[in-house]
């Protein structure tokens, strides 16, 4: 897929970027690829990655997706883009919604415009379950980001830049997520702070997140949205699983929901399920390719579609305590923390 091609990863020093590079290095894909450009604004993280990976095929570009000129110049000669740069912390975005808009919406506009301008072959835009039925600023900004990508995809002719979207559930042990928080609390002998015990979240590994993006990259058509089917757990079961794994007796304290949190998350809305393709491990939601000339639909009508149940962390496969423990023990992060416990 990547032979003699140049790939750019925006926000490439984050959890996803590190997971992709780990996959490429272990699988040997890095040997076939021409160049991987890491585009991000944190010079310290770039330097850490440069030293840790020490691979001549990695090229580092300091810049911000909010600045069109910096992303446009860095994208010259790029064949493919994985757009992972984002503000993703829900409470932070609640307090600074314009910052979420500037990065997640306007920043994405810059990335997509630069990709089209530089005749990039395909762009995969990384979104989130919080973009479905959004109630918080982060989810709203990501929902608008998706709409922006699909609108641009709708205007592309055959042979032009292909724009696809992937939606994640909760990526376990990613930066700023709850698993590192619980493990730190366990190690420090503190109470485990749970917002709401019955709250459910999808459980997706960083390996799964890379699989999803590569699947979309290989199979995606213009304007497609891809979702990976994932199991879920309540937050209380997740905390108890970590207690068992680390042989912890820490107390659990319920603190109530944080700003902008939902009781459960949705990956596919009921309206989207009506047109989604079930691809066994994934759902593909095709783009609505209709234009603004709706007259023909009033005259000819439109076939009726069944309203299906949405795909949520409440109605997906629910893992019990032992299943969650088994899943957590597959994570490199958890294994490393156990070694250092």
Swiss-Prot record:
Organism: Rickettsia rickettsii (strain Sheila Smith)
Family listed: Belongs to the polysaccharide synthase family.
EC number of the protein: 5.1.3.2
Protein name as it appears in the record: UDP-glucose 4-epimerase
Keywords: Isomerase, Lipopolysaccharide biosynthesis
MF (Gene Ontology): UDP-glucose 4-epimerase activity
General function of this protein: Epimerizes UDP-galactose to UDP-glucose.
One Gene Ontology term from the biological process aspect of the record: lipopolysaccharide biosynthetic process
Pfam family, one: Polysacc_synt_2
Family annotation (PANTHER family): UDP-N-ACETYLGLUCOSAMINE 4,6-DEHYDRATASE, UDP-N-ACETYLGLUCOSAMINE 4,6-DEHYDRATASE (INVERTING)
InterPro entries membership: CapD_C, NAD(P)-bd_dom_sf, Polysac_CapD-like, Polysaccharide_Synthase-Rel
UniProt cross-references to CDD domains, sorted A to Z: UDP_invert_4-6DH_SDR_e
Keyword Isomerase in annotation: yes
Upper lineage: Bacteria, Pseudomonadati, Pseudomonadota, Alphaproteobacteria, Rickettsiales
Record has Isomerase as a keyword: yes
